[in-house]
Regions:
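Charged, amphipathic alpha-helical coiled-coil/dimerization segments
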Residues: 104-159, 163
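Canonical helix-turn-helix DNA-binding module
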Residues: 66, 80-125
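N-terminal helix-turn-helix DNA-binding core of bacterial DNA-binding proteins
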Residues: 35, 45, 49, 53-95
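Exposed, interaction-prone assembly regions rather than primary DNA-binding/catalytic cores
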Residues: 157-176
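DNA-binding alpha-helical recognition surfaces that contact promoter or target DNA
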Residues: 73, 101, 163
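N-terminal leader segment of winged-helix/HTH proteins
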Residues: 1-62
Length: 176
């Protein structure tokens, strides 16, 4: 039977109860002072799973993961199409080994090139190729059409989510 479930996270119609709301209820009976924090983190983690799945479905026809798309898009945004791989890691907020792996996969597909910096041989540069630019543009159009997985959310709500998560990032030390 479908029922309207009222939770602290809004009303929804469901055949089954919201597992996070149920976890919140259970947590509240044992650790009430932590229940809201647990539910917030669990909700963010679940939303991340759902959105990554939607985004990767959009990117699949292009043979890209979201990490690979982000790397291509970052390179495409630069004036020269080239960045030091260390700087890419900083801008993408990932470990340098992750950048190396992603760039390696993109390089094997001919979407980026990799080589030493002419100014400092210790620095490895990644450069987007014309084929990489084409795929980055096509994938960006597809993601824009999909609303990045949240097309059904009003823009104002998306902005509210961004603002709320910014405070989480500040609290976690990700931003000043």
């Amino acid at each position: 039977m479908r029922e309207r479930v009222k939770t602290a996270y809004g009303d929804r119609v469901s055949d089954t109860p919201d597992p996070i709301a149920e976890a919140h209820r259970q947590w509240s009976s044992r650790w009430p002072e932590h229940a809201d924090h647990m539910a917030a983190v669990t909700s963010v983690m679940r939303a991340q799973q759902l959105l990554l799945s939607r985004i990767e479905a959009v990117l699949k026809p292009y043979g890209l993961t979201f990490a690979a798309y982000e790397a291509l898009r970052l390179l495409a945004f630069t004036r020269t199409g080239t960045l030091p791989m260390g700087k890419m890691g900083t801008r993408l907020m990932v470990h340098p080994a992750s950048v190396t792996n992603v760039i390696g996969r993109l390089e094997r597909r001919g979407l980026v090139g990799r080589g030493p910096s002419p100014d400092d041989r210790r620095v490895v540069l990644a450069t987007i190729t014309p084929a990489g630019r084409d795929i980055a543009e096509d994938a960006t159009l597809a993601l824009n059409r999909s609303g990045f997985g949240i097309a059904d959310l009003p823009a104002a709500e998306a902005a509210e989510i961004t603002a709320a998560l910014r405070s989480v990032r500040v609290s976690a030390g990700d931003l000043p």
